[in-house]
Curated annotation (Swiss-Prot):
Gene3D superfamilies: Fe-S cluster assembly (FSCA) (3.30.300.130), HesB-like domain (2.60.300.12). GO terms for molecular function: 4 iron, 4 sulfur cluster binding; iron ion binding. Binds 1 [4Fe-4S] cluster per subunit. The cluster is presumably bound at the interface of two monomers. Its cofactor is [4Fe-4S] cluster. Involved in iron-sulfur cluster biogenesis. Binds a 4Fe-4S cluster, can transfer this cluster to apoproteins, and thereby intervenes in the maturation of Fe/S proteins. Could also act as a scaffold/chaperone for damaged Fe/S proteins. This is Fe/S biogenesis protein NfuA. Belongs to the NfuA family. Keywords: 4Fe-4S, Iron, Iron-sulfur, Metal-binding. Pfam families: Fe-S_biosyn, NifU.
Amino acid sequence: MITISDAAQAHFVKLLADQPEGTHIRVFVISPGTAQAECGVSYCPPDAVESDDIELEFNGFSAMVDEKSAPFLEEASIDFVTDQLGSQLTLKAPNAKMRKVSSDAPLAERVEYVIQSEINPQLASHGGNIMLVEITQEGVAVLQFGGGCNGCSQVDITLKDGIEKQLLDMFPGELTGVRDVTDHQHGEHSYA
């Protein structure tokens, strides 16, 4: 479920040495499955362990995960990185905002997952996003742009060279193309 690098494990052991005996760490997700999802790590004293917690044993400590957060922490990783600017703990949880879907899930769910987990994070740097409206019987993913993408002069390039290429590569034989149904209104909100 969660991978913790050797460097991060050593860091946690060092931090926990100053805590009361039996204290572990807790890894959690606030607002899991939403765009506002945030992950965190905290101390977990023995009296804060819940009966439905999942205990993940590591070298010298355990990581406690509440039942609600668990599916959103699949494939999560924690690392302790040191560079010339200092050290920092990093927590990456690719499924925090949206639960990973199985490979046999309906096509619309799998496409939506890719949009939320891979495409929208890229568009977010421009204040934009896309939403899946439907997948037609012909296999065309009908999309609607929002935020900074609405009215952007680069939207056709983003759609054809970026999004369509990525989706067709990921869903060969299932998707045949993409179509934009956005009523584009160029304004101050538009990226370009």
